[in-house]
């Protein structure tokens, strides 16, 4: 009877959790794929552009290796264990390589000594036996065994090898590293370089390579790169790592740099170019395809290591019946093999459910279970649990008649494995949930979302019921918490109840802030987790503990909670003071340039929906409290009936606009040169009747200066509700590379100087459907700050083979945009009528009150227009216009002067720059004056803002030169405005 009681409790004690040991042991001295010395806020810049390479940040690549011959770098490599480095086979063809080559790790800049740098001798080299140096296109991989072991620390760590079931989809942005040449036949850099490249579909790569040489056959390669070139690995990068990031953050060695035709050459339309000018994507040796060879050679020095010729050391496959046992390995005295991949599918009679009970469990531990692990999938392929460590997982009740188990082991560290018993049970024996299992917990331990530490599943509906011993209450303490944020937690949520009926709510949680511990009011607690159909994060991990009611409790508020999204307070102290900064920073899970993903709610706070007839028509971006920019083709036919238009800001879900700001359109201003047929000058401004109220969901986007130009392959972001062919009700985001003009013109007729293309030319989803018109394309300027560079104009239809999107180039329209807004506000020409007859004259006074977002008018009736030379200090206390000139004639050592603009105490200053040209002059702008001034900006001819706003009432422009051939011409207007 006692035995039956114990088994009954075991059946009820069901939870989906990562098994772990009783102590928080590291499992290994190192943690592969992590960067301990890198700043937590710093990551590989996936929105950077590199031609041949740009300097990596020291500490970001602790697995990087330099192979040096006679002290000079010639190839790269990657640390994968304390004694092994991976490189390309073609890098280690020297017969006496052990004598001539040394391995340098912890090095970043070759020109300086770094404390982290260590030099190792080579003990042995193992080239893949199928590598052919005459045709070095396949199996280009070698293991370098070091003479001594590496001592891992914060500066030196191994990269992760891929597991057999790692999948990185086409378009995923990955990183290549090396000290290779910055351009074809160019110079070698002194510091480590990095380049961001998207993965190319395998068959697409093969078709490209046929244009290079039809005789080439590729079996073990992975390709990456941009069709228009501009980014690539280059000479000297050979053997270096090509890494992709798992969803939970670890970096995986997907490839080893092998070869490419030229460096960063374009390969789009290769067949049209002469052979000597053709290019190719970057070609990397595919590590995943060579895992078996790696495992066999990395474990040669382990005498007790079991070797198997088959992929799985036991009999896997289909298990049918009402009960049975699965063992790995089959002999309890042995270990499981490294590099194993075993798959079992359990099928019980139709109408039954499956109970899994673990008898033993000992699998290499890792906090994210990425090394060795057992995963369990439902019949529909939904992940139920992922397990590692030496603690037996609790019994799992699978709400189906079929379940799949997969065991994966990596190339090092092996344990005694596991054994489990499966049994068919009646469906109604225990309550099920859509998680595929139910958790009824009687013991202290951990719970977590399915698939943690990977993203949780869509449509989850999970439930845990916790019972504590008599005279105890339950405490849940959160270790990890990342759940899709939303106001009121309406999308994904974790709810804690004080009762089994679900009537006493202890707390509702979502977002990224770690909730406070939650205490029950009795010895029962119910926890539910639900998710909608999209936007999945890492979920939560929490500790369940039992405490006495007399234990100290902060207050009753500790029992309740509502975990709302974090604000980006550091980036934006006040909503009114900035542009292009999201209080809820954007976040990408997949970093894919082909398939869009749902944006984190309100992370693009300038994006608006333009509605006509109560339906979403197209997109736009907020420029000020009263102006929105969009495409002319969106609104050109609606100029005469603007009042039927509605601008919806702060919107994430088109079907749920409860918290959004809705503004009626006052008038529409289409660029006067807009051509309906050619879509040239495809830009328009929309003025709303009532100003937007800036908050965490509604913010303006920054405008670029008129001289800005995007370089090819620059990665930017386009947002919209329709990026993946079908119209999505929730806002999506997609990273897109900017294409070269000639590539764009090859695919589209009618590309003008006011257009550019961005996106991927591939047989995937089109990014420029009709309903996406007007959507903003934004690029990072400073970290966390975005600038609008493009407005979606047109593209091919959604049902055709896609091409890149065509965008109106915003920098070229800056003069028109600013002139229009200024004329409405009455600044640019206060004594003249507005430039656009659609703007009623009686609206000008209303506009003046809306600054600084719409550039304001002067508060003072007096003004001064001054023409001065650069000498001494000049104080300007009335608004007006000034032209500052200087030349070598001003003095034998050039000129030096200060312009101090002094507004009333409660005002700010608006500078409107009209012209700047200088030779050997330094122009610096400061907030404040004299000893109280602080640096604000440095002006150059290439980087001059159209308008600059001060924070306080005083701003200083300092011009200086010591050169005899110096010259300066600065022309600007300035105005003072009330802070209120």
UniProtKB/Swiss-Prot annotation:
Gene, per the UniProt record: OVCH2
PTM summary: The catalytically inactive 108 kDa form is processed both N- and C-terminally to give rise to catalytically active and inactive forms.
Maturation-removed propeptide residues: 22-49, 593-980
Domain CUB: 312-425, 435-547
Cellular-component GO terms for this entry: extracellular region
Signal peptide start-end: 1-21
Protein name, UniProt field: Ovochymase-2
InterPro entries named in the record: CUB_dom (IPR000859), Peptidase_S1_PA (IPR009003), Peptidase_S1_PA_chymotrypsin (IPR043504), Peptidase_S1A (IPR001314), Sperma_CUB_dom_sf (IPR035914), Trypsin_dom (IPR001254), TRYPSIN_HIS (IPR018114), TRYPSIN_SER (IPR033116)
Disulfide bridges in this chain: 75-91, 174-244, 205-223, 234-263, 312-342, 369-388, 435-462, 489-510, 618-634, 716-779, 744-757, 769-798
Glycan attachment points: 39, 766, 858, 932
